[in-house]
Amino acid sequence: MMLRSQAKNVDLTSQADSRHQQKRKQAEQLDALKNPSEPAAKKQHSKGLTELRAHISGFKIDSAKRDPLGKSRTSRRDVENLPPQKSRYVDPCPHYDYDLEEAGNPDSISDYAQGIFDYYRHREVHFRVRKYLHKHPEVDVKTRAILIDWMVEIQETFELNHETLYNAVKLTDMYLCKTKNVDKNTIQKLACVAIFIAAKYDERSPPLVDDLIYLSGDRFSRDELLAMERELFATVGYDLGSPLSYRYLRRFGRVCRVDMKTLTMGRFILETSLMVYEYAMVSQSRLAAAAFVLAMRMLDKNNEYEWNPVLEKYSGFTGEEVMPLVEHMNHILHFSKDKWAQLTSVRQKYSHEVFFHVASIPMLPDTLKVVDSHTYAPVPMLSYP
């Protein structure tokens, strides 16, 4: 029989061995933390996996083909929708700030006004129209001018906003720019649809479809008009918020604090310019700036109004970038009166008392007159915008 003392010694020895094993295990764990190593594979890799690992480990990246660090890939649409970036800019008229002076006027939204028009200018390139008549054999410069004259008549008939007219013309040009072989039977339907869409975009009560069909002489049915509406929407990408020269002109009139007669004269010049095919390729902001300067000159007693720092500040153009277009717009006023005498909608509209009879104000001498010609002088080469 084992004695109690012997049993006690055995128990103590067992406890000592247990403590020793525990300390050794703790030491091994501590050593593993200090010197970590990859655990051995439980089984040998297959031949295919071994070859794959060898290929991956030997793969090298060509730094010449790799994008620079920190450079993200952006699509064209992403670039078009980026806000305008501020560049080095020297204020040509630092002593005058129209928006600061209008800070107390809630109608002027002076905190945002300049930013809005900066964004408009940034977006102009997105709605750029390029030459398209070569793609439509049945449509020429005169046909387009007749169409725009008729659209002005429709705008007056329904008493639509001016923005609706300008937007409708822009939609028409954008559609023709992106399509081919539009015939004369389709182009009037296109104009009706453009007015219909622009009115739904800008008016409280757009014209009825049946009224548009009636004014077009019942040349197409209701279903045909609605089908054309869907086609125009798809062609322009459902993008209707085009910057308009009419809005730029109103902005220039405000910052220069001109009277309503001067602003109306500018509108008459701009609406006349809508009939000129080549002007569809000119930026809306430049057209507005040129029309504004020409209006100021026509109403100035000495016809000596010049480009000034205020206009440069708020239009973004220098005088050299605008004055050639001013001269050509004056030529167009003469040409439209002499050669397009049957296109009377714009001139009759601005002969009314409500528009200060501005259409009857004497024009400046035409320095670009083309003798015995049925076409106007070439439009000067202009950058965009």
Curated annotation (Swiss-Prot):
Entries under CDD domains matching the protein: CYCLIN_CCNB3_rpt1, CYCLIN_CCNB3_rpt2
Annotated stretches, region: Disordered:
1-48, 63-88
> Per the record, what phenotype accompanies loss of this gene's function?
RNAi-mediated knockdown causes a longer meiosis II in 1-cell embryos without affecting meiotic exit timing. In a pam-1 (or282) mutant background, restores normal timing for meiotic exit.
Polar residues: which segments have biased composition?
A: 1-16
Give the Basic and acidic residues compositional bias ranges.
Answer: 17-28, 63-80
Q: Which GO terms describe its molecular function?
A: cyclin-dependent protein serine/threonine kinase regulator activity
Give the GO cellular component terms, alphabetically. cyclin-dependent protein kinase holoenzyme complex; cytoplasm; nucleus
Q: Does this UniProt record's set of keywords contain Cell division?
A: yes
Keyword Cell cycle set for record: yes
Q: What does this protein do?
A: Could be involved at the G2/M (mitosis) transition. Interacts with the CDK1 and CDK2 protein kinases. G2/M cyclins accumulate steadily during G2 and are abruptly destroyed at mitosis. Plays a role during oocyte meiosis II.
**Family classification:** Belongs to the cyclin family. Cyclin AB subfamily.
The protein depicted here goes by the name G2/mitotic-specific cyclin-B3
* Species of origin: Caenorhabditis elegans
Q: What is the lineage of its organism?
A: Eukaryota, Metazoa, Ecdysozoa, Nematoda, Chromadorea
